[in-house]
Amino acid sequence: MTAYKDRQNRTYRAEWQTFTSNKVNLPFGLPAAKRLITEHLPKWELRSSKHGDTALCYAKEKKIVLSKTSPLWIVCHEIAHGLVEEKYLPPGHHEVFRRYYIDVCEDAMSPYWASKLSKSFDAGRLDYRYPHEQPMSLAQRIYRIFK
């Protein structure tokens, strides 16, 4: 398995453990998606289709299809991908994506869920710093794992 694929799978595993092991569905659907897309990605426009609701980003022509009962954490995940693309960074589940994901969760859901998600990333040894942030020392990493 490539390092890229392993990183993708570990990111999915961390978010799945955060939101589904706690029986969190958060089915806010379209209103949440519309609010998030409007607040975070002004270039995006919401259009409806028979399969769900499609958000179209004109910058990269990326489509996100959300059902009317999409859990809010899935909406946050997709918006984090959109924020990464707006910065012209490579797609995928890298540390900048995970940082955006935590930030969007904090804005859209609550600091509680953002904290739980960051702890899941810590448990999976997945980094989520912006590139300009200082790396943590070994002592800081150990403290984060056991706190």
Q: Model-found features: residue ranges?
A:
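Walker B catalytic acidic pair
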Residues: 78
